[in-house]
Amino acid sequence: MGKTPVEAKKILHDRPHVDCPIKDLISRIGDKWSMMVLMALDNAADNVMRFSELMRAINGISQRMLATTLRYLERDGIITRRVYPEVPPRVEYTLTKRGQDLLVPVKNLVGWISNEWPEIEKSRDAYDRQSDSKSN
C-alpha cells in the first residue's frame, strides 16, 4: 500500500535534499524522453519493442538519447532489455512490473494534463498579459 499524505510529508521533511530518492526518481522518470519511452512501450503489442521501433515511435529523439534513456530506465528496473543471440543481433525492451505500476500515476497525470491544458493555457495568457501591462 502507498504512503499516507502524513507519511509522505514526513519522508520529504526528514530526508536531506541531496539524498532524496523522490527528487532523484522524479528527475529521471519525469524527463521528456522517459515518459515517451514508457508510453510507447505501453502502446506496443505485449509492451515489447525493438530499438528501431522505439526510434520510429518517438518523434524527435536521437539514437544517443534513446540509448541513454533506455539504459537509465533499465538501471532503475522500469524496463528490461533482452538480447537474442542472432545475426544481426535482436534486442527487445519491455516494461517490468515496476514499469507497469509506474504507468498508473503517469496515465493519471497525462489525463489530468489533457483535461486541464485549456485552462492552463488561459492562465498563462492572463498572467503574460498582466506581466506585459506592468512592464509598460
What kind of region is each of these model predictions?
Residues 20-65:
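N-terminal helix-turn-helix DNA-binding core of bacterial DNA-binding proteins
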Residues 37, 50, 82, 120-122:
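Short, hydrophobic secondary-structure boundary micro-motifs
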Residues 2-7, 19, 103-136:
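Amphipathic alpha-helical dimerization/coiled-coil segments
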